[in-house]
Amino acid sequence: MKNSNKLIASVVTLASVMALAACQSTNDNTKVISMKGDTISVSDFYNETKNTEVSQKAMLNLVISRVFEAQYGDKVSKKEVEKAYHKTAEQYGASFSAALAQSSLTPETFKRQIRSSKLVEYAVKEAAKKELTTQEYKKAYESYTPTMAVEMITLDNDETAKSVLEELKAEGADFTAIAKEKTTTPEKKVTYKFDSGAINVPTDVVKAASSLNEGGISDVISVLDPTSYQKKFYIVKVTKKAEKKSDWQEYKKRLKAIIIAEKSKDMNFQNKVIANALDKANVKIKDKAFANILAQYANLGQKTKAASESSTTSESSKAAEENPSESEQTQTSSAEEPTETEAQTQEPAAQ
């Protein structure tokens, strides 16, 4: 949640400003602060804060939140939001209220942020489903490792982890016994089962296990815990690996989940989905102070790309009309020398 807190805090900062402005929208000169010889109006406050980096980021989040609420609002239920909220509360335990307060959040503002995140998440997953081609399935199958049974030791510092690894390498070492003695996990849990698409096990641990043969033991694997921001250290031993079937369709359901999960984590893919939603909403920036907040989504949306291509074609046509001789010369030159794309296409034939 610490990552989320940083993001949410920025959202709340400007959301509060915008809420204040909205409440006083009938008169931007409404006074919110008075003092001897001076006053501060809603307009003063808005103009003072709108150019800050926090406000820029917060306005972007506010726009995205409104756009996705309008387009996907019926896809996320109150029950889902409540469930996610309580899960986070349980993870933080007694410190949850303090964590909210530190981020200038109330339970309701945090729930609104959860809802916005889930709306984007839904849209991304729906877009990912449209990418489920046979080629994508086969690509996912190539890197897929079926269920593995592993024993895993979790440790809190590098020095201890290296010492434990040396102990495991000693002749006759009993991995299971050492694991149960040394691991720092609750209830001394050391046995796990997962495949290469597991999301409840650190990615680097999954990769290490996937690369091992039965009986193989990994080196020390260092992983930054995204919740505590503390490093954890893992050592894994693969005790059994399921044989991989030759037909990818045997794993189609699982591969589908993996493909969707991977695309959902892909920031470029996420940005394209957001860009398309912004295009569909026909978002227009009215205040030049926020002119660049959507720059990262420029030319990613379908409409934006089409408009850009149309503009390029139009400009090229106009240039050709104004300089016919230059256009003819360009065409002649193009006919004599293959374009970069043509050259790339021709290379395999020459091999």
Swiss-Prot record:
It is a lipid-anchor. It is an enzyme of class 5 (isomerase). It holds the Pfam family Rotamase_2. A lipid is attached at residue 23 (S-diacylglycerol cysteine). Its EC number is 5.2.1.8. A lipid is attached at residue 23 (N-palmitoyl cysteine). Residues 303-351 are annotated as: Disordered. This is Foldase protein PrsA 1. It comes from Streptococcus pyogenes serotype M18 (strain MGAS8232).
